[in-house]
Structures are given as structure tokens and as C-alpha cells.
């Protein structure tokens, strides 16, 4: 283990056979950051960071990224249990061989344009990316991200963690059943979704790899169940989240699990979404974190 401190296209409805799963409550399905700690939900009036080839767009550039993408993206409906389904945005890579599947877990703001644009970048990097809307059953109204965000923040605090993990189980099974998919999957999440992606490593023994962007770590008592390698990527100016790193690192070290993490000096919570912020530190963090993300998935899912 190591710590490295470094300066809408076509809509298609599909249904999968019901997936039966069990889950154990792991961490609260809540995000405890204050509004001031979050990157802005809408950045339409904020300056966008310069678009760097090979990086996801920031929030201000997400819609343009989606509108100009050459890749095939589609909406699907995935059956997750008796009477339950989750909608998801799926983006396919342009490659001649079968691809690993990556689940993309949204922030507290819900399945925003920005999260879908991150899925598009993962597809550009060679993965089948599936971003589930974990608020599907809340029936939030359609609308721009600025309308969705405050509703999502309130709704996400009511989600049951075990239910969230069952949704992810079903989405993973769906993804690996696709004709173009390998039978391996990883997960990446941001903020609230980062905590969920770490919790999924506790929950899912078949998970191939997890990447956690500025999400809190699970309770140390749960970490013995982790089997997948976990990569954590954190802003140095994110004290509440960063305080949960050392206990996880120590516990996973004793257990002999693979947990690597980087803390980027000066970068804030949500640095990948808000690349123009924190006086250049967020963009520097994004430029280091995203290649590390892709390399992690390639190492553990492509080999």
C-alpha cells in the first residue's frame, strides 16, 4: 500500500430478468458535507477549465462533451428485483474486442450531465460504462441539472444502503451479460458515490476493482470483507473525508488487502467536477487522478 502526495443520444428501454441479491447494511447512504463544501451543482455561469484531451469534462463543459461525442450512448431500464427497475446511461467503446464493464456511481446531485460525461470518457478509454440513476424509484422530475440537484440532495439521504447495493448488483449482472462485455467489472464513484463504491468493495466478492473519488471509507470492522483492489483519490483540502483514510489504510494493511491512495495538495472536494477551482489545484489533481483511474482498471480488469 502506498500514499502518493502529488503537486442525448438514442433512448432504448431494455429489461433484464430479475436478479435476486442479498446485502448487509454497510455505511449510511448519506452525504454529510455541507452545501459550502460541495462543488456547485450547476456551473453554467462558472468558468470552465480548459478541456484537456483524455480527461473528463468539468461540470461546465459536460453537455457540450455529450452532444459532441462520437460514441454510442443509450438509456436502458434494468430490472433489479420484483417490481423494481433502475434506469441507466450506457456508453460503448469503439473497440474490436470485448470490454470490461465499469459502473459509474453518481454524486449527491443525482445522475447529472456531468456524471454521464464521465461515463463517456470511460468509454473513450475502452470500457463499457454504465451510470445507474439510483434515484429512479424516487420519480424526480426531468429537467436541467440545476433543477435536479436540490431534489436529488434531499432524496439521496433517504436511500437504504442495502437497497443501493442490490441495485448495483443487478446493474453489474446486466453489464456483464452484454454481448460486447467481458465477464469482469469495476466501479468508480464520486463524493456520495465514492463512499458507495468503497462500500461495494465490502459487499461484492465478484468485484474486480474499485476507484473512490473523495468518498468516505467504510467502518474498519467491515473491511475484512474487501477482496477487490481499491484506489482512493482525494483532495488535500477535504478534511472530513481525508480523516477516514488512515483507519482504512491501517486496517487494510493488516489484512493484506490492496488499497492505494493519493491526496492532492490544495485540491478540494469534487475536484474532478470543478476543475477550474481551488486556484489551479483541482485541475492538477484531475490531470493526475484520471490517468491513475484508467491505469487501475486496465491493470485489474484487462489482464
Q: Where is each model-derived feature located?
A:
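Serine-hydrolase catalytic machinery in alpha/beta-hydrolase-like enzymes
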Residues: 26-58, 62, 66-67, 75-177, ...
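A conserved short beta-strand
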Residues: 206-215
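Alpha/beta-hydrolase fold nucleophile elbow
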Residues: 179-190
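Short beta-strand/loop motif that positions the catalytic acidic residue
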Residues: 232-234
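Acidic catalytic loop of the alpha/beta-hydrolase fold
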Residues: 237-242
Amino acid at each position: 500500500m502506498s500514499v502518493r502526495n502529488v503537486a442525448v443520444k438514442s433512448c432504448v428501454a431494455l429489461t433484464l430478468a430479475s436478479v435476486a441479491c442479498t446485502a448487509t447494511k454497510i455505511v449510511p447512504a448519506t452525504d454529510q458535507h455541507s452545501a459550502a463544501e460541495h462543488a456547485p451543482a450547476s456551473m453554467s455561469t462558472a468558468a470552465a477549465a480548459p478541456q484537456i484531451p483524455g480527461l473528463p469534462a468539468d461540470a461546465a463543459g459536460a453537455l457540450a462533451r455529450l452532444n459532441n461525442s462520437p460514441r454510442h450512448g443509450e438509456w436502458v431500464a434494468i430490472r433489479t428485483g420484483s417490481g423494481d427497475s433502475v434506469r441507466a446511461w450506457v456508453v460503448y467503446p469503439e473497440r474490436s474486442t470485448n470490454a470490461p464493464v465499469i459502473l459509474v456511481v453518481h454524486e449527491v446531485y443525482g445522475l447529472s450531465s456531468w456524471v454521464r460525461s464521465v461515463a463517456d470518457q470511460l468509454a473513450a478509454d475502452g470500457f463499457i460504462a454504465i451510470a445507474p440513476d439510483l434515484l429512479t424509484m424516487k420519480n424526480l422530475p426531468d429537467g436541467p441539472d440545476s433543477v435536479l440537484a436540490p431534489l436529488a440532495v434531499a432524496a439521496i439521504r433517504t436511500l437504504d444502503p442495502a437497497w443501493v447495493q442490490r441495485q448495483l448488483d443487478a446493474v453489474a449482472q446486466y453489464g456483464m451479460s452484454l454481448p460486447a462485455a467481458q465477464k469482469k467489472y469495476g466501479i468508480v464513484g464520486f463524493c456520495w458515490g465514492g463512499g458507495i463504491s468503497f462500500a461495494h468493495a465490502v459487499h461484492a466478492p465478484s468485484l474486480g476493482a474499485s476507484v473512490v473519488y473523495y468518498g468516505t471509507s467504510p467502518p474498519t470492522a467491515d473491511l475484512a470483507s474487501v477482496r477487490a483492489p481499491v484506489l482512493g483519490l482525494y483532495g488535500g483540502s477535504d478534511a472530513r473525508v481525508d480523516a477516514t483514510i488512515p483507519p482504512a489504510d491501517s486496517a487494510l494493511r493488516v489484512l493484506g488487502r490492496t488499497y492505494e491512495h493519493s491526496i492532492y495538495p490544495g485540491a478540494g472536494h469534487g475536484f474532478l467536477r470543478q476543475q477550474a477551482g481551488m486556484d489551479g489545484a483541482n485541475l492538477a489533481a484531475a490531470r493526475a487522478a484520471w490517468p491513475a483511474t484508467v491505469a487501475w482498471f486496465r491493470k485489474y480488469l484487462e489482464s
